[in-house]
Amino acid sequence: MENITFTSGLNSEMDANQPWRPWLSQTSRKAPDYKPYKRPADDEQHKLSIFKHPVKLFWPKSQCFDYLYEDAEVLLRNYPVQATICLYEDPDTEDEEDYSDEEDEKELR
């Protein structure tokens, strides 16, 4: 077989018997690395971020229906970052629920 070499075009400097394999790229054809989630180095960063994202605001479940619409709206309006409200169990509400369950059992007897 005859060895053909291209002198112009995409396959220049490549042998016709060897197909182009992009995963075996040369440094001249390699695009610069793009890292969208890379944090800037300290020397690049002018202002240190106070918040580490994602930001979660913990809100007690006992107040979720009573105050969520008014107080949470004010809290999120004054909070300088995008945040998610995460509900958590109050230690006080568990005692109240246990107490109410005991009362219900007494009433049923």
Swiss-Prot record:
Basic and acidic residues: bias regions: 30-42
Cystine pairs: none
Signal peptide: none
Annotated Gene Ontology cellular component terms: nucleus
Compositional bias segments (type: Acidic residues): 89-109
Polar residues: compositionally biased ranges: 1-15
Presence of the UniProt keyword NADP in the record: no
Sequence segments annotated as region (Ripply homology domain): 53-88
Tissue expression from the record: First expressed in the paraxial mesoderm at the 90% epiboly stage, and subsequently confined to the presomitic mesoderm. Expressed in the rostral compartment of S-I and S-II.
InterPro entries xref list: Ripply_fam
Pfam hit, one: Ripply
Location of the protein in the cell: Nucleus
Domain notes from UniProt: The ripply homology domain is required for transcriptional repression. The WRPW motif is required for binding to tle/groucho proteins.
Protein name: Protein ripply2
Upper taxonomic lineage: Eukaryota, Metazoa, Chordata, Craniata, Vertebrata
